[in-house]
């Protein structure tokens, strides 16, 4: 199912959406934070999706528990370290871990730049212990507004040498991308790549805006592109990468079933699209789950799965020499 001659990558993976249940339990008790359950087993349903069905509201409540226990910078560093470990344990050769320092800082009023530094330190520590290639993507959480996003961006750009890209995430309908054009001019001036969550809650126009005004060369989710034939043609012709997250889309009710997911529509249109986990801690999945699910639930052949694997490597925010090195390591 997984082609072992092709690097296995996960490019849309939220570091702050992948906190182990045991870590939430440990940090909650360490910092005297009231948890919603009295046992580790009882905690799991409050922080992870149980079964296939969910809603965006239920999903986000679980996600909030992942950052509710980040009471100090050591906790942030631990979570970053464990994200590297989890990426390696799940069999990934390369992962891009994205994080919103404002979101991670807000519950316990941590310094935003301190959170950025703690994430970088945790990842560096993880890379000493685990054999996996990792890059970081900074997130601006649009739901907190323009001013908060500018604070977040400045904290991230102070450490831009440790980032490969910036992302825009959060409430796509309430905070459209046009509110952040000035922010992304700073990102482009800093020389970072750009991805954006778009076409998930809003329509194709949100994706056009992200590409034409923000400068995005990759789009997170993008499921609503299929309603705009011109956009689909543009995506294919310009090799705009679509970071597809089928299980997450099901869990947030972006799609109602795997069979309804537009992954195959994108592939048949020649769009560059790859498989990703999104918030693997909340969804209780790993990357192999996504490949297995696409095969079993959506009828993809092994050849099509291999193409998805290759697409992921092509879409990665790495140099051609780094891409070659990933392939060479699989030979």
Swiss-Prot record:
The keyword Hydrolase applies. The record marks 221 as: Important for catalytic activity. GO terms for cellular component: cytosol. It catalyses: adenosine + H2O + H(+) = inosine + NH4(+); 2'-deoxyadenosine + H2O + H(+) = 2'-deoxyinosine + NH4(+). Its cofactor is Zn(2+). The active site is at residue 200. InterPro entries: A_deaminase, A_deaminase_dom, Ado/ade_deaminase, Metal_Hydrolase. This is Adenosine deaminase. It comes from Shewanella loihica (strain ATCC BAA-1088 / PV-4). The gene is add.
